[in-house]
Amino acid sequence: MVELDYLFLGSVGFLTIALMLIILRIIKLYFDEKQARKRKEALSAMAADEHAARNERDVVVVGGRRVQTARRRVRHNVDDGNNDDMGFVRNAIDQNGDISEQEDLPSADLARDEHFGKKKLAKLQAKEERRKQREAELLEREERKKLEQEKEKRLQKEREKQMEQEEEERKRKCREREEREKREEEEYKKLRETFAVDEEGFDQTDGEESQNLLRDFVEYVRKTKVVNIDELGAHFNLRTEDAVDRLNFLVGNGTLTGIMDDRGKFIHITSEELQAVAKFINQRGRVSKAELIEYSNKLIALESRCVEHVSELTAA
C-alpha cells in the first residue's frame, strides 16, 4: 500500500506540474498576442497621424501653388491679350491633377508600409524554413552515419564468421589429408610385408626383394592386360583376396588404371587409351552406348599390344 501511495502521489504531482506548465504556456501566448496586437495598433495610429499631417501640409502647398499659378496666368493674359479662356481652363485642370496626385500619396505610403511588413514576415519565414532544413539535414546525416556503422559492424561479423569457417575447413582438410597419408602408408607397409613374407611358400626377403616383387606384380598386370585374379594369385603365390587387395591399392594410389569386371578379371587401361576415348567423345559430341563400346574395343587393346597401335587408331 505504501508503494501504491507513493506511485499515486508521484503520478498526481507529475500531472499537476504538466497542467501548470500548459496553463503557463497558454497565458504566455495570450499576453504575447495581446502585446503584438497593441504594437500593431500603435504602429497603425502613428502611420495614420503621419499621413494626416503630410496630407495637410501638401494641401497648403498645393493651395499656394494654385493661387500663384492663377495669378501668373492672369498677368500673362493681361500682358499678352492674345490668349483666350482655354488656357486658364487647362491650367485649372493641371492644378486639379496635381491635387489628386498629392491626395493619393498617403494611400501609397500605407501600402508601402504594409509591403515592408509582409517582406519582413516572409524573410523571417524563410529563415525559419532554412533552420528547419538544416536540422533535418543534420538528423539525416546522423541517421545515415548510424546505419553505415551498423552495416560495417554486421559486415565485420560476417567476415569474422567466414574466416572462422575457412579456418575450420582448412583444419578439416589437413586432418583428412594426414589421415589419408597415414592410411596409405600403413597399407603400403602392409603390402610390402605381404610380398616380403608370404604364408604360401615365399621365404623371408629383404626390402630390395620386396620392391622387386611389387614391380614385377605391376609389370605383369600391365603386360597381361586382361588379368584373371586366380591366375594372378597363383603366379605370385597369393590368395585371391590378397591379390584383389593389392590391385585395389595400386589402383587407388594411381600406379595402375583399370576396371574389375563381374567375371573375376581385371582389365588394365593405359592413360593413352583413356585419352583416346575422351578425345573420341569430345569429337563426336553425343554418342550412343553401342558406338562407345565399339570404339572402346578398337582403342583399348584387350590383349598385350604396343602403344603405337593405339596412337595410330587415335590419329585415324
Swiss-Prot record:
It is a single-pass membrane protein. The keyword Membrane applies. The keyword Transferase does not apply. Keywords: Endoplasmic reticulum, Membrane, Transmembrane, Transmembrane helix, Ubl conjugation pathway. Gene3D superfamilies: Winged helix-like DNA-binding domain superfamily/Winged helix DNA-binding domain (1.10.10.10). The chain crosses the membrane at residues 4-24. Residues 147-187 are annotated as: Disordered. GO terms for cellular component: endoplasmic reticulum membrane. PANTHER family: DDRGK DOMAIN-CONTAINING PROTEIN 1. Substrate adapter for ufmylation, the covalent attachment of the ubiquitin-like modifier UFM1 to substrate proteins. Belongs to the DDRGK1 family. This is DDRGK domain-containing protein 1. It comes from Brugia malayi (Filarial nematode worm).
